[in-house]
Amino acid sequence: IQKMANAVKNPKYAAVMDAYKNKKVVFIIDECHRSQFGKMHGQIKKHFERANYIGFTGTPIFEKNKGADGRTTADVFYAGDKLDSCLHRYMIKDAIADGNVLRFSVEYQRTIFAKNLAKGIDPEQLDGPEYCKRHKIDMEPLYHDDERIASIAKHIFEHHEQHVHPQGKDIYTALFAVDKIQTLGKYYDEFKKLNDEAPTDKRLKVAAIFSYEANEDMDDGADEHSQELLDRCMRDYNALYGTAFMIDTFDAYRKDIAKRLKQKDLPQVDILLVVNMFLTGFDAKPLNTLYLDKNLIWHSLVQAYSRTNRVDKVTKQFGQIVSYRNIKQWQDDALTLFSGDGDPNEYLLENYEYYVNQWIN
């Protein structure tokens, strides 16, 4: 959309753009839930007066999940009062039934326990906004406690093999999404410590990527400027893989990471630490696990989960989600919304105890 919007405005392309201004043209737009809500879409529509627009998305913007803009995907792709703006619906359940994507296995790990809380507070309800509001609980210091972060990093380090090396055969890759850059830096350092302490054959190749503000100030109490952290991560990456990326070659760094997650003839990245990048629109069949220490809702949740469920080798039987926050209600709400008010459990494997009982009986 950026290229077309620029072409419409740039005098250099005026002759070409004007030639199509009054012609019947069709724009086919992928990932239309996230790219068409700004000014650029309007500028393009204004120029091409007779154009039609067809958008594809796995996670439309509905009334329930619309943003501050107030519009839905149907509003942006309005087809007139007599027509349904949605031409066709192909739900996740259809894709699963057709064998085009996999179901999800979701595992929740409790990381905040009663010993860290005031008397009478139930740790199992801490991620419920209403419960926290009623009991005046601020989750932020609990989530970002250094001891908790170290514990989660250790849990991932110790159990990563079982997630990405199913049946002792093929090896897959993983994302670890956290809530902000400062948290990412803490996890990155914890993984470095764990690697330093581990035998060579047990070490994990951990990389990190995030967008940063070039003119960032330090008023938020950050321990390290985000650009300095990114530069440090890139230097470690260069040492690990024999590359030479710098801040001003960020896009090449991003592309190299993508190739390694996809296992494209390069030594792979085992775990990629992210905040928002790679959680939408990135497809890598060898990626089978998403670790989460981040609250996600609606389309952001489904998009993030869907990084893991692309069909690959026979040993990849489902996409794995390991969440260190209790986002089950948000998960169920999102899966219900994007299934046309269906059953969210259609997309999920049962828990471990269910399959044990099935086997016993």
Question: Which residues are covered by each model-predicted region?
Answer:
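Conserved Walker B
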Residues: E31-H33, F278, N295, T308
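Conserved helicase ATPase motor motifs in RecA-like P-loop NTPase domains
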Residues: E31-S35, H47-K66, G99
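Interdomain helical connector at the RecA1-RecA2 junction of SF1/SF2 helicase-like NTPases
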Residues: K66-I171, Y188-R203
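Long, hydrophobic alpha-helical segments
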Residues: D312-N361
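Short basic/glycine-enriched coil/helix segment immediately N-terminal to the Walker B
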Residues: A7-V25, F48, T249-V269, A284
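Conserved C-terminal RecA-like helicase domain
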Residues: K136-V274
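A short beta-strand element within the Helicase C-terminal
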Residues: L273-V274, F278-N295, S300-Q303, G319-S323
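Conserved RecA-like ASCE ATPase "motif II neighborhood" in helicase/translocase motors
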Residues: I1-I29, R34-Q43, Y253, V274-N276
